[in-house]
Regions:
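Beta-sheet repeat architectures centered on beta-propellers
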Residues: 1-197
Length: 197
């Protein structure tokens, strides 16, 4: 838990394929992975919540526990209604070089790049997705969104004209509305060298 919390509100995840650990915020008191059931299940204890069902003759002032079915649907559905499960993925910074020899395409950041368009390659897209191109002139600077972004992508979007320019570019794909889900394919940009300053 965070230092000001008395309940579990953080999680750690290990990616076996890449050998990488990540941390995140996730309020869960207990968790059981898929195996006995088709999906993982978890509980979350909320100390200031009243249970949704009454207990005859007892006033519960100790809070309530919620049961979650993970990896099931695209939204969070409970007694309070349906809310979106916001998610995003962001690439690392990448740069380009003006070298044409395939053996020397190391992306050394010598040149600025002009990103004319983003070409969506969603294998699955339910609802919309938001694309943000972050551009940066130097590694120690704070990356900013391209002037025209963020961009909304639908299942009928062929391309997005971006007019982004920077030495370093990273891409964020996000969803923040109910009923949205996506699976992305290959990153596709129309980019070219655009000078040294």
């Amino acid at each position: 838990p965070k230092s000001e919390s008395v309940q579990i509100d953080r999680c750690v995840t290990y990616n076996y394929a890449e050998g990488v650990w990540t941390t995140s915020s996730l309020d869960r008191t207990t968790y059981i992975d898929a195996g006995i059931r088709d999906n993982p299940y978890a509980t979350d204890y909320v100390d200031n919540r009243t249970p949704d069902f009454p207990i005859q003759g007892i006033t519960n002032t100790y809070g309530a526990t919620f049961l979650y079915s993970h990896e099931n649907g695209t939204d969070q559905v409970n007694a309070d209604g349906t809310t979106s499960i916001d998610s995003f993925i962001r690439s690392g910074d990448y740069d380009i070089t003006n070298t044409r020899d395939i053996a020397d395409l190391r992306g050394d950041g010598q040149f600025f790049m002009s990103v004319r368009r983003f070409i969506p390659d969603f294998k699955v897209l339910q609802g919309n997705s938001k694309i943000t191109l972050f551009i940066n002139d130097y590694p120690n600077n704070t990356a900013t969104s391209s002037p025209l972004g963020p961009f909304t992508v639908t299942s009928t979007t062929d391309k997005i004209d971006t007019r982004a320019r920077g030495r370093l570019v990273s891409i964020k794909i996000a969803n923040d509305s109910t009923g949205e889900s996506w699976r992305y394919g290959t990153m596709r940009l129309d980019a070219r060298p655009d000078g040294r300053r």
